[in-house]
Each structure stands twice: as C-alpha cells, then as structure tokens.
Amino acid sequence: VARRVALVDIEATYTPDWGENFGIDNEGLILVRPTLLSNCVDIIQALLENEEISLVVLDSMSAIGTDEEIGKSMEDQQMASGARFWNKACRKFQAAMNSNPTKESTLIVINSAYQKTGIAYGDPEVIRNGEQLKRTKSLSVKFKALKKLNAKVDEGEIVIGRNISIECVKNKVGVPQRSATFFYAYVDYGGTQAYSTD
C-alpha cells in the first residue's frame, strides 16, 4: 500500500527546489509549519493516526518554544518548560502509533546536541528537552560532521562537501553500537579530485 510522508518543518528551512535535487516528490510530500508547540504536537499526533501516512519527520525538536515561553517576556524564567512539555508529547506520540496495530507508523525526530559548560568529569554533551525521548525512541542515530573536502577547479578551489560519521547509539529493532562514515556532497563537482583541508 502506497502511503505518504509528512514533514513538520518547524525551522521553515525546507525548499521544494532543493528537495527535488535529492529526489523528493514535492507533490506527494505533506509539508506543515506550525508556529506553536501545542499545535505541533496535535498535528503530529493526527498525522501518526492517519491511515494514508506512514512516515512523519519533525525538524527539529529544539527549534520551537512552548506556548508558555512564547507568551511571556524574555525576563520571565521558564524552568524546564520544554522538557516537561516534550515528556508529555512523547507519550502522546507513542499512544498514537500504538492506536492501530495493523498500521506501520514511523516518527523521525531531529534534535541537536550541545556542550554543557563547567563539566569537569563525564560527558558534557547534552540533548535538550528532557529524557523522555531517550526512553521512548526505538532507534537513535548520532550524526557528526567531520572534515571538509575541497576540489580544485579552474577558478581555484571550492568546498564540495564533507565527511559525516554516523553512530547507532540505541537500537531496539536490530544490532546497536554500529558506526560508519559517508561523504555528503554539497555540489556536483563533476568527479574533480577531492582532498581534505585538515
């Protein structure tokens, strides 16, 4: 059964022309751009329950503030409001995917890692918006940018892309702790010899 894909583009960075370069069928893609987090969660829940949609992509988890945060002054402290909200949202998403056992639903959540300052021991890397997503997700893949690659052209040299490392840090549906690297090309450089800048 052919089903559709939905992109919840909170960052508002997706452009149809650029997506078409990667083979995305813009006619079949459902593109939504919510402005409030509460609307975002309701939309994702409805998409996951929709029989015609099998894949929902959220880009990105850290790009939108809570309704409470947006509606108040910059001086007002909102302690962990995003974490509390996303903890509840993850449970709603899980319930939506489990509501129909015969329907295959997949939710891809893009998030960002940050370096926490003042950490003398242990891992300073933190993921925003609470711990619920770590417990809920079945598969977690970490992407990290590596060396930029340049190519010599008639005008000099240009950056044509960079190597990306990926690591499967959690996997409930397969073998975890696997890693790989791949080359992400920025432009079609016509097979020009590439070399590392580092």
Name each model feature, range by range.
Residues 47, 79-196:
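Phosphate-binding/switch region of NTP-binding enzymes
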Residues 2-88, 92:
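Conserved inter-motif catalytic segment of the P-loop NTP-binding fold
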Residues 1, 21, 136-140:
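Alpha-helix C-terminal capping segments
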Residues 1, 54-56, 107, 193-198:
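Generic low-polarity alpha-helical segments
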